[in-house]
């Protein structure tokens, strides 16, 4: 079946109608429709797929969000909410005859309550900005995606984001108490509550990860946690990638829940080391980063237990961070894996999938086989603790 060509005249007329309807409710700078202005919104972090929207709206208030949605609902124009555009699953990719609704301008931290350990923020607030705002209170926001310096809390809700510490501290779902949002017809609703257990269906869990299809997020109440007194990281090297994968399963089987448990293969560690000089073992076929946090006594005990498991699993080298500076240096390598890939390849396609931990080693071997079969390089980095894989397939889109 041949797909008919798009009706350019009809699309142009629809765009004109939409822009005319939105102009009365938005400032001039908050409504974009010219191609040179909307190109930055043609994709999110999954840059292999691109599509131009009819227009981009950048509201500055919840009321404007509601008015925009009412207009689009009446005109039957699809709306794609967008945070910072760092997502890797195409959740903010536009619809060609739709509107991109950017929440980037709703970026206020509305309140911080150190007694209930909560903060109320708008969706455009950066993930890391929450922790920065409460650092003086000895608190922080636990979910820490690799893009936390740029990603927004609204986008985190839409994708149910995790991060390198999600094994112990959970995903966005486990760290948010309440979400306020707007339905497609403009109705303002709230999901969740400040109570430990609110009556009725758990609609908050349904909204998490829904990519804005159920409601456009306008306000989020997040949980804050106390900073641990101490944190240390083990960097374990393996001369065989299968041993590294099996070590992950062995740590969990031993009843240990590390604060972070990440794995990178040799290609990734080499790319990262050239970029940030994290001190990684460049001869290792795979490295594991295993973090323990808590009181000094708890950390010492857990580090000893993990070291024993790693040695029994065949680790060829073990290095424990000496201080906070070295701990952050170890993590900086993992968190810069994506930009490091961008330095060595013109393009890369990042996969984002989850497998049972027991299959990590097998899958890594399969990926190595496919690299040889198809002649494409691949950097493997993932949240080993929950089996969330991020293979970065390297290519040149110009070929």
Model regions and ranges:
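ATP-grasp fold ATP-binding core
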Residues: 79-81
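C-terminal substrate-recognition/cap domain of FAD-linked oxidoreductases
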Residues: 32-42, 222-226, 232-399
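Flexible glycine-/small-residue-rich
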Residues: 103, 181-183, 393-395
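FAD-binding subdomain of flavoenzyme oxidoreductases
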Residues: 108-262
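N-terminal flexible segment immediately upstream of the FAD-binding catalytic core
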Residues: 1-70, 87-117, 146, 266-277, ...
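Feature of Fe-S/electron-transfer and energy-metabolism proteins
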Residues: 1-17, 36-40, 56-63, 70-74, ...
């Amino acid at each position: 079946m041949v797909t008919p060509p798009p009706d350019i005249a009809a699309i142009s007329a629809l765009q004109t109608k939409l822009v005319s309807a939105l102009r009365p409710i938005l400032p001039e700078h908050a409504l974009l429709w010219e191609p040179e202005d909307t190109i930055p919104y043609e994709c999110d972090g999954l840059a292999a797929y691109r599509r131009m929207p009819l227009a981009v709206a950048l509201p500055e208030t919840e009321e404007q969000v509601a008015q925009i949605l009412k207009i689009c609902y009446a005109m039957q124009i699809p709306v794609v909410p967008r945070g910072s555009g760092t997502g890797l699953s195409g959740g903010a990719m536009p619809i060609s005859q739709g509107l991109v609704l950017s929440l980037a301008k709703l970026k206020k931290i509305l309140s911080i309550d150190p007694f209930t350990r909560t903060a109320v923020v708008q969706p455009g607030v950066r993930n890391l900005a929450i922790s920065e705002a409460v650092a003086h209170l000895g608190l922080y926001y636990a979910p820490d995606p690799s893009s936390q310096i740029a990603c927004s809390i609204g986008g985190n809700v839409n994708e149910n984001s995790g991060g390198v510490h999600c094994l112990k501290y959970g995903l966005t779902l486990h760290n948010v108490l309440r979400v306020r949002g707007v339905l497609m017809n403009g109705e303002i609703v709230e999901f969740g509550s400040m109570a430990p257990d609110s009556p009725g269906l758990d609609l908050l869990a349904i909204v998490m990860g829904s990519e804005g299809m159920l409601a456009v997020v306008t306000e989020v109440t997040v949980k804050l946690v106390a900073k641990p007194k101490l944190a240390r990281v083990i960097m374990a090297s393996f001369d065989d990638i299968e041993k590294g994968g099996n070590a992950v399963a062995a740590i969990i089987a031993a009843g240990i829940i590390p604060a972070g448990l990440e794995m990178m293969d040799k290609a990734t560690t080499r790319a990262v080391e050239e970029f940030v000089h994290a001190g990684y073992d460049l001869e290792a076929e795979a490295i594991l980063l295993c973090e323990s946090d808590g009181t000094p006594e708890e950390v010492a005990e857990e580090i000893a237990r993990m070291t024993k498991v790693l040695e029994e699993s065949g680790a060829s080298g073990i290095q424990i961070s000496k201080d906070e500076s070295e701990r952050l240096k170890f993590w900086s390598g993992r968190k810069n894996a994506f930009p490091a890939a961008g330095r060595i390849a013109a393009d890369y396609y990042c996969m984002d999938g989850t497998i049972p931990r027991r299959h990590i080693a097998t899958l890594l071997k399969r990926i190595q086989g496919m690299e040889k079969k198809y002649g494409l390089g691949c950097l493997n980095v993932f949240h080993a603790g929950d089996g969330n894989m991020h293979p970065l397939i390297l290519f040149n889109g110009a070929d």
